């Protein structure tokens, strides 16, 4: 049982650090966006986000912000997935729905 818990703990650490290994603090500086878009190209209801698209979210994009209880999808910036819509802050996409998350104390 102790070995299983240790393996699960190590797997969790690996998952958390994977993003840092791929998208380190200087990734966007070392790999600048090759196809940036202008802020003026975003049309309502989309909003301009400077760091949203491409691998590690190094490029700007026009994004629609979703309200509470809207359908959503989680994505991986490490592999370059770029959703055109994301949950509006401070909402989080949980089980495919934008949900208000109470901060832990």
Curated annotation (Swiss-Prot):
The keyword Oxidoreductase does not apply. InterPro entries: FPI1 (IPR021066), Ser_Fungal_Prot_Inhib_sf (IPR053741). It holds the Pfam family amfpi-1. It comes from the Eukaryota. Keywords: Disulfide bond, Protease inhibitor, Serine protease inhibitor, Signal. Gene3D superfamilies: 2.10.80.20. The keyword Signal applies. This is Fungal protease inhibitor-1. It comes from Antheraea mylitta (Tasar silkworm). The gene is fpi-1.
